[in-house]
Amino acid sequence: MENIKKLVKDNIAAIQKSDKTFKDIYDVMFSHKDHVACEFLENHRIKKITYRELSEQINGFAAFLRESFPQNVGEYIGLDLKNSVEFLISFWGILQSGNKPYLINSFYPEALKHKLLTKLEVEIVVTNFGCYSDFHVVDPYECSYSALSEGLSTDWANEIALSSSLTGLDAKICVFNGEAVVGQVNAAVSILKRNHWLRLGYNGNIKILALLPFFHIYGLMASYFLLCFFGRTLVFLQDMSSDVVRGVVNRHEVTHIFAPPILFHKLYKGITKTLSQESEKTRKKFNTGMKIACAVQNIYPLLGVSISKKLFKEVIDATFGKSIRFMISGGAHIDKDALKLINGIGYPLFNGYGTTETAITSVELRKKIKHRVSGSVGAPFDGITYSVSDENTLQVTGSTNCKKIISFNGEDTDLACICTNDIVRSQNGHWFVEGRRNDLFIGENGENISPDVIQNELKVKNANNFSVLDVDGKLSLVLEYNEAFPDLVIQKEVAAIKQSLRSVHYGLEVRDIYITRDKIANDNAVKISRANLLKMVGEGKVRLQKYDDFSGNKKEEPRANQPTSEQSRTTSTQTALTIEPSASDDTEASVLMVKQMFQRALDTTDDIDVSANFFFDLGGTSLDYFTLINDISASFNVNINLEQKNNLYTVLDFHKYLMEVL
């Protein structure tokens, strides 16, 4: 069996003796020629590519670029590809050809992409996307080049660039050299010193899920360089849907996942949603098991993880399987309940921190579960120092910092110490992020309030997304729901949220609640940008409806940038948290909705008696019944377990059931 500990020691020794350039990184990384560099599904079978095979393709692509564009050597080349073998070939091939890769944010609007490319004086773009007609496009899927066993004898470039904002607002370009990446690789050594779980594999392998795009600093530094520098295996996905992610993790026996909280929040919601449909006995059994698991993991952490996986075998089998050994959440706030449940069932999940400008700088690595679920982002890695500015924001000093920031206003190279704008506090040497300074809201008494403090404590069950932010000078909550999501469920959820706000820190400062059926963030966003949300509201792309006016009408009028005259007359103490739907309205609305679903399933316009049996009185078939179940499940966002609930035959049966679970 491979000695991972010795391999790490040898690789680190080799890179420390070098000049710490990208070529040096490549030489050490690709010295493990027969190790599997990456794998993916091709024609429903797992295809594996070794570091030797990948290196030959990289050498060939580098020669192609050098021969095709000799006049561009030393310049930036744009790179816009999804995570794939072709991305790796292109990334390293560009560097080997003497050019500098600029990792284009694929989610940016076309105009912004072009503006940033122009800023870097880019002429060539490696891509298979069709929005670069103004540039010389090289499609690695179509261009012809031969695999070469030896690389070019030319000077490598030692610089890469990527954008600093996922939203595109105030986008800047951060430039890293090989030394900064070596600093990130050294983080792996810091992690191993504090927690050896990072080097645990499954069936002798360590496999990392390539989930987050490599144009994102977290995707590039954590998912790729952190472990692949030691000859580990990347696993690529066909797409990012939940079913595909779950299937790939299980099929490929993925061991390590570094991802934004959205992945872990989806996992948490899926588990809790399924659990809510189970019997009371099953739920009590689960909760008892969770208490036992957490207690053991606080005394014997690694043994406790093994026990948890046995206690929750059914949950493990239904989600990511039994191969997961180490996961890190980063890029945004993760809910403590999600941390507790995921760690509790036996998936070690740690909370990390970093920015585009600083790369990944800390992870909460203490093994006891009480620390893993605390919300801490840990202590900084070796060689990195945290300090607090006069404005109580985090400052980062260390070797992972980018070496240059390019903006439309000029360049900044004085980056030994970078101010992150994140409000933090330290507790016994471990750090907690409490919000962004530029998101602070000034309360009526002049106190600075971080919307994140409210948002991080608030429990919202059914909304796709939500955000606490300043709308028209008032601290407000925006809730996003699907177009067809029932108004009744929204009303019940808002009622629960209002109650919850009473016990949340600064919750009573929230003056208005808004409902929208429009997406308040891009599908691929790591987190919701408040500035971008307000921009979309101002442009009419997100239509907000104040909950006071919410009456089940799906048509929502766009809000203007400025408050209406009626809103202007509203005093600062008036609140939207006052209107409650009556119980009779709830009952009438839900019964009517279920009756309409009965009609659709039976393909009839006849009135449905609320006490009529679906089969005996209404003549429904088994196929009709499953149509009804699917309609109700999708519309009310519930998972009806027919093995547990086998007595749902009438409108009133379904109404009673929905009132119990919603």
Which ranges hold each PLM region?
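N-lobe entry segment of adenylate-forming
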Residues: 1-68, 73, 157, 550-587, ...
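Conserved AMP-binding/adenylate-forming
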Residues: 44-49, 62-107, 210-211, 307-432, 437-440, 455, 617
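Conserved AMP-binding A3 loop
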Residues: 50-52, 157-186
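Conserved AMP-binding/adenylation subdomain of ANL enzymes
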Residues: 185-207, 214-313
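AMP-binding/adenylate-forming catalytic core of the ANL superfamily
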Residues: 388, 392, 412-414, 418-506, ...
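Conserved C-terminal "lid"/linker of ANL adenylate-forming enzymes
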Residues: 499-576, 629, 644
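Thiotemplate assembly-line natural product biosynthesis machinery
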Residues: 560-608, 627-635, 647, 652, ...
